[in-house]
């Protein structure tokens, strides 16, 4: 496994991360039945990835994304919290909602997330996220309080990620790209501002 420094966070993460969609169950009716391992099975899969060198685990809040946080928390407890980097997120855009989401995620995980993203930020919610006591302000507040280590914005829109790259409150960005859809990634690679932030890519296999 190869590793990279994640921007200026000081985190060194595996090039291949573990996204927790394949281990979740509950409240996700669009997923087929095989996406339903129990906790023991889910922990075994995550441990196998860890033994192959993966140290970055990306999840999202219960209940919207099933029980993945709970299973990841069980894995972190078994393997040792200091051995992995936990990236978490919630699709909330106001400051109050985001603040409460982080508290709930921390309870589900049984530990403090390393990175927490406002998830799937779109043009309809962009100004809310970056505005006065929006999600960005709440994440910065949570970081100052030690409830998360780093702040993040996740989006499918280049202009929103660029806005995050210009924002001193934001440490890490997350966008989508894969071998079939490289348009946004190519633009990001050409923009020097993105080199000042950590960047995670999701949907690299055009799946979860």
Regions found by a protein language model. Give the residues of each.
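Feature marks short, surface-exposed loop/turn motifs that line or immediately flank catalytic pockets
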Residues: 22-25, 63, 92-94, 119-124, ...
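N-terminal binding-site loop/beta-alpha segment at the start of enzyme catalytic domains
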Residues: 1-84, 144
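Short, acidic/polar
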Residues: 34-49, 95-109, 155-165
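Hydrophobic faces of well-ordered beta-strands that scaffold small-molecule active sites
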Residues: 14-18, 57-59, 84-88, 113-118, ...
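CE4/NodB-like, metal-dependent polysaccharide N-deacetylase domain
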Residues: 99-117, 141-145
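Acidic (Asp/Glu)-rich catalytic clusters
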Residues: 7-10, 51, 73-83, 102-112, ...
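Acidic-and-aromatic substrate-binding clefts and catalytic sites of carbohydrate-active enzymes
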Residues: 60-69, 91-98, 124-127, 178-185
């Amino acid at each position: 496994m190869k590793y990279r420094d994640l921007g200026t966070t000081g985190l060194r993460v595996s090039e291949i991360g573990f996204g927790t969609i394949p281990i979740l169950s509950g409240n996700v009716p669009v997923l087929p039945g095989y996406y339903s391992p129990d906790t023991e099975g889910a922990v075994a899969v995550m441990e196998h990835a860890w033994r192959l060198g993966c140290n970055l685990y990306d999840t999202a809040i219960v209940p919207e994304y099933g029980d993945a946080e709970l299973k990841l928390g069980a894995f972190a407890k078994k393997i040792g919290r200091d051995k992995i980097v936990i990236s978490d997120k919630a699709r909330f855009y106001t400051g109050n909602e985001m603040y409460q989401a982080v508290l709930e995620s921390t309870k589900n995980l049984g530990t403090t997330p390393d990175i927490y993203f406002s998830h799937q930020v779109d043009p309809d919610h962009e100004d809310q996220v970056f505005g006065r006591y929006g999600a960005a302000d709440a994440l910065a507040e949570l970081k100052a309080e030690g409830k998360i280590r780093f702040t993040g914005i996740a989006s499918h829109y280049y202009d929103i990620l660029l806005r995050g790259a210009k924002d001193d409150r934001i440490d890490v960005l997350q966008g989508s790209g894969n071998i079939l859809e490289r348009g946004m990634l190519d633009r990001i690679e050409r923009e020097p501002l993105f080199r000042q932030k950590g960047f995670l890519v999701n949907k690299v296999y055009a799946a979860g």
